[in-house]
Amino acid sequence: MAKADFYETLGVSKTADEKELKSAFRKLAMKFHPDKNPDDADSERKFKEINEAYETLKDPQKRAAYDRFGHAAFENGGMGGGGMGGGGFANGGFSDIFEDIFGEMMGGGRARRSSGGRERGADLRYNMEITLEEAFAGKTAQIRVPTSITCDVCSGSGAKPGTQPKTCATCQGSGRVRAAQGFFSVERTCPTCHGRGQTISDPCGKCHGQGRVTEERSLSVNIPSGIEDGTRIRLQGEGEAGMRGGPAGDLYIFLSVRPHEFFQRDGADLYCTVPISMTTAALGGTFDVTTLDGTKSRVTVPEGTQPGKQFRLKGKGMPVLRSAQTGDLYIQIQIETPQKLSKRQRELLQEFEQLSSKENNPESTGFFARMKEFFDG
C-alpha cells in the first residue's frame, strides 16, 4: 500500500512554513493521540503517520529530499533516518512541543506523576441546615458522616497481617511505565499495580487490599453564634483516610440557614414587617415584638404613622461572628385596611370621610393637585 503524501497527512500546502507545520501537527496529534483513543487501531495508525510526516517536514534537509524524491528518499537507509530511525529525540525531535501538547493530558508533568508513595485522602462535603434561632445562639451539632477510614486489621497496608506489600516489578515502584508510540515515549499508569507502586499477593480479608474501609462516623460540629447562610466550616483531617500512610483529607460543612417565618436577615441586621390597624396608625398605640433572644420589646406607634414607617430596635439583631457587636432589628409598619365592614362601621367611616379636611390627608390631597396642575399646564 502506497504511503500517503506527508503534506496531505498534515493537511498543509507544499509551501507551508514552520509555524503552519507545527500548528497542524499540534491539532492532529491531540486528536489522534492513543491516550485519547484507547484500543482504536485506526487512530494509532494515523498518529504514527502524523509523527512521521512532521518529523520529516520540520527538518529542512529531510524536507528538501522528500520534495525531490518523495518517500524513496528514505528507503534503503537514505538520509539515515525517517520512519522509526535516526531522527527522533536525539536530534531534538519534537520534544520541544511534546510537553506543551501532552503535558496536561499525561497528568500535568512530572510533578503530578504517582511515585507509588503516600496519597492524601479525599476531602468530603456535608450539607447542614440550621434555623435562624440556632444561627443567633450558636450550637454544637452531632452529625454522622459516611467516610473511608484506615483499615484497623492491616493498618492501611492492604496486606494480610503478617505479610507486606511488594514493590511492583513492572514499574519498580514508580507507579508509571513508558511505552513507545511512534516517535513519542508515552508515560502511562502501571497496568500491574494501577499506579500504587506496590502489589499485594495476599490481601487483607477486611479491606480486600484497599487499606481502607467505609464506615459512618459521629462527629461534633461547633457552630458559632452569628454564623451566616453559605458559611463553610472546615474540619481538618476529618475527610477520607489517606492511602499508604498518607494524610487524611478534610471535611467541609456547608451551612444553610432556613428562612424564618417573621424575620429577614441582612448581615447582622434583622427586618420584620408588622401589620397594624388603621385606627392604631391614626390614633397611635403600642405593640410587643418577641426577638430572637426570647425577650419582648415594646414598640410605640405615634399617631399619624404612615405605611412603611420603620422603627429601629438597637442591639436586637444578630450577633456579629467572632465579635462583641450586635446588629439591629428594624420594624417596618404595614397598615391593614379593614375588610367586611358592618353597616354601622361603614356609616362611621363615611361620616369620618365627610369630616376630613386637607390637613388630615396632606399627601393624597397634595398629590392629586400636583398631578392636575402638571397635566393641565
Swiss-Prot record:
Cofactor details (free text): Binds 2 Zn(2+) ions per monomer.
UniProt-listed Pfam families: DnaJ (PF00226), DnaJ_C (PF01556), DnaJ_CXXCXGXG (PF00684)
Example of a GO biological process term: protein refolding
Subcellular location: Cytoplasm
GO annotations of cellular component type: cytoplasm
Major localization class: cytoplasm
Residue ranges constituting the J domain according to the UniProt record: 5-70
CXXCXGXG motif repeat feature ranges: 151-158, 168-175, 190-197, 204-211
Upregulation: By heat shock.
GO molecular function: ATP binding; heat shock protein binding; unfolded protein binding; zinc ion binding
Binding annotation for Zn(2+) 1: C151, C154, C204, C207
Keywords: Chaperone, Cytoplasm, DNA replication, Metal-binding, Repeat, Stress response, Zinc, Zinc-finger
Zinc finger map (CR-type): 138-216
Xref: Gene3D superfamilies: DnaJ domain, Heat shock protein DnaJ, cysteine-rich domain, Urease metallochaperone UreE, N-terminal domain
Residues holding Zn(2+) 2: C168, C171, C190, C193
Cofactor: Zn(2+)
Database matches in NCBIfam families: DnaJ_bact (TIGR02349), PRK10767.1 (NF008035)
Domain notes: The J domain is necessary and sufficient to stimulate DnaK ATPase activity. Zinc center 1 plays an important role in the autonomous, DnaK-independent chaperone activity of DnaJ. Zinc center 2 is essential for interaction with DnaK and for DnaJ activity.
Annotated function: Participates actively in the response to hyperosmotic and heat shock by preventing the aggregation of stress-denatured proteins and by disaggregating proteins, also in an autonomous, DnaK-independent fashion. Unfolded proteins bind initially to DnaJ; upon interaction with the DnaJ-bound protein, DnaK hydrolyzes its bound ATP, resulting in the formation of a stable complex. GrpE releases ADP from DnaK; ATP binding to DnaK triggers the release of the substrate protein, thus completing the reaction cycle.
Subunit comment: Homodimer.
Family according to the record: Belongs to the DnaJ family.
Protein name (Swiss-Prot/TrEMBL): Chaperone protein DnaJ
Phylogenetic classification of the source organism: Bacteria, Pseudomonadati, Pseudomonadota, Alphaproteobacteria, Hyphomicrobiales
